[in-house]
C-alpha cells in the first residue's frame, strides 16, 4: 500500500507547495490567487510541463516574462516538500471573463539550442561520446546508461536535424530513452526500472484502495509477431545475402500474465556460426505478421539493435494500465517499477513501469494520476541464421 505518508488517524491532509521565480520565493504572492497547478512528468523528449492558473478578477496579476525560470516544490503540510525541478516559462495566456492567467513552463527550453537544426557527422565514436558532446553544447550534464554508453557508432550524419530529434533517433535505434530532467540530459534503457547510472529504482506497491479510478486495456499481441531490419555494408565484396531471426534466450518467461491461454512453447535451436554477409535482413520475433523497419542500416549489429529496440517497444505496449491516486504522491517519478493488487488477476500478476505522472493540486486537494506499461526485464537474445 501507499505508505510513504503516515499521519495520525482523524487528521486532515492539506496540500502544500512552494514556487520560486528566478530564486525568489513568490508563494505568498500567489497563494490567494492559485486556482490550480498541474505538473506532468513525462518519459522521453516530451518535456515535463508545469501549468499554473491564477485568478485575475481584479486585474492585478503581472504577466511573467517568457524565459523566466520557475522552481516548484509540492507535497503536504507537515511533510517535507519534494522538488520537482526547474521549468522555463514559454507560454502565457490571459482569458476572461472571469479573468484568468495561465502560465505554462517546461523542463527544457525548446525555444533554445536543443530545437535548432544542425549539420554534422560522427565517425568512429561511441553512443556515450555523442550524447556527452550534445549535452555539452546545450549546457547540460550528460548521464548515459553504462549498457548504452559503449555502443560503437562507425558513422552517422545529423543533416538539418535538431539535437532533440537526432537524440530521439539514436535512442530508437539503440533501445534507449532520452529526456531532459533538472539540467541533465538522460539517456537510459526504457522500462528497466533503473536510473541512467544503473542504480535500481525502488519498487512501489499500489492497492486498489489507493485509487479512485483505474483503466486497463490489453491488445492482441499477435497484431505484430516480429520486427525485421535490413543492413548493407561493404566489408565483404561478395554479394552474399543473409537473413537472421531474433529469439529470446530461454529463461524466466516474460509477459506471463498476458500470455494467450492457447499459446504453445517454441523449441529453441542453436545458431550456427557463419561469416557476416554484406547484405541481409534481421528479424526479431516470429515471421507470421512482421513490422518492417524502413531504414537500411550500415552493419548487422546496428540492424540487430534497431530490431530488438522496436520489438521490445511493441512488447511493452501489449497492455496499458492507468490509475488516479486519491492521495497525491510527489515522490513518484517515471520509470518507477510498480506492483499492484486488488484488481483482476491479469493486472495483479504483471509487473509495471510508470511512463507518465500527472500531479494536480489546488487549495482543496492534491491527486496523482499514473500511466503504466508492461515491464520488461533485462532480456537476452540469440540468433538463428536462415541461408
Label every PLM stretch briefly.
Residues 125-136, 160-172, 224, 228-232:
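Polar, S/T/G-rich
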Residues 2-7, 100-109, 146-221:
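Short beta-strand-centered interaction patches in the first periplasmic/extracellular domains
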Residues 95-98, 126-143, 298-305:
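Glycine-rich, acidic and aromatic/proline-enriched surface loops and short helix-turn segments
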Residues 74-76, 189, 342:
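Conserved "cap/hinge" positions at secondary-structure junctions
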Residues 1-112:
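Assembly/oligomerization scaffold segments
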Residues 110-118, 130-157:
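N-terminal export/assembly leaders
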Residues 86-95, 120, 192-194, 351-363:
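Short, compositionally biased
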Residues 33, 37-65, 211-387:
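An acidic/polar, Gly/Ser/Thr-rich interaction patch typically located in mid-to-C-terminal regions
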Amino acid at each position: 500500500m501507499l505508505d510513504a505518508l503516515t499521519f495520525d488517524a482523524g487528521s486532515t491532509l492539506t496540500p502544500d507547495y512552494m514556487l520560486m521565480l528566478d530564486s525568489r520565493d513568490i508563494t505568498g504572492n500567489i497563494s490567494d490567487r492559485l486556482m490550480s497547478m498541474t505538473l506532468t512528468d513525462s518519459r522521453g523528449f516530451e518535456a515535463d510541463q508545469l501549468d499554473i492558473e491564477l485568478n485575475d478578477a481584479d486585474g492585478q496579476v503581472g504577466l511573467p516574462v517568457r524565459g523566466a525560470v520557475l522552481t516548484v516544490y509540492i507535497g503536504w503540510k507537515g511533510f517535507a516538500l519534494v522538488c520537482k525541478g526547474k521549468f522555463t516559462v514559454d507560454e502565457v495566456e490571459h482569458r476572461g471573463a472571469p479573468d484568468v492567467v495561465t502560465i505554462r513552463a517546461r523542463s527544457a527550453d525548446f525555444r533554445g539550442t536543443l530545437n535548432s537544426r544542425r549539420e554534422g557527422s560522427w565517425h568512429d565514436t561511441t553512443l556515450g561520446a555523442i550524447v556527452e558532446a550534445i549535452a555539452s553544447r546545450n549546457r547540460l550534464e550528460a548521464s548515459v546508461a553504462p549498457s548504452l554508453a559503449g555502443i560503437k557508432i562507425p558513422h552517422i550524419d545529423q543533416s538539418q536535424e535538431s539535437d532533440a530529434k537526432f537524440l530521439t533517433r539514436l535512442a530508437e535505434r539503440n533501445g534507449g530513452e532520452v529526456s531532459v530532467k533538472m539540467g541533465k540530459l538522460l539517456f537510459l534503457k526504457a522500462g528497466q526500472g533503473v536510473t541512467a547510472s544503473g542504480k535500481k529504482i525502488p519498487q512501489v506497491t499500489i492497492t486498489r484502495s489507493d485509487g479512485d479510478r483505474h483503466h486497463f486495456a490489453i491488445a492482441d499481441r499477435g497484431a505484430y509477431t516480429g520486427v525485421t531490419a535490413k543492413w548493407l555494408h561493404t566489408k565483404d565484396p561478395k554479394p552474399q545475402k543473409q537473413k537472421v531471426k531474433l529469439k529470446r534466450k530461454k529463461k524466466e518467461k516474460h509477459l506471463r500474465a498476458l500470455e494467450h491461454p492457447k499459446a504453445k512453447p517454441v523449441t529453441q535451436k542453436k545458431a550456427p556460426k557463419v561469416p557476416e554477409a554484406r547484405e541481409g535482413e534481421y528479424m526479431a520475433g516470429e515471421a507470421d505478421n512482421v513490422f518492417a523497419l524502413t531504414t537500411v542500416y550500415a552493419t548487422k549489429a546496428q540492424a540487430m539493435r534497431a530490431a530488438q529496440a522496436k520489438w521490445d517497444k511493441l512488447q511493452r505496449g501489449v497492455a496499458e494500465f492507468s490509475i488516479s491516486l486519491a492521495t497525491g504522491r510527489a515522490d513518484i517519478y517515471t520509470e518507477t517499477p510498480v506492483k499492484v493488487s486488488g484488481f483482476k488477476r491479469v493486472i495483479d500478476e504483471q509487473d509495471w513501469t510508470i511512463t507518465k505522472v500527472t500531479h494536480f493540486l489546488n487549495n482543496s486537494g492534491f491527486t496523482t494520476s499514473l500511466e503504466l506499461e508492461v515491464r520488461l526485464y533485462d532480456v537476452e537474445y540469440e540468433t538463428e541464421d536462415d541461408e
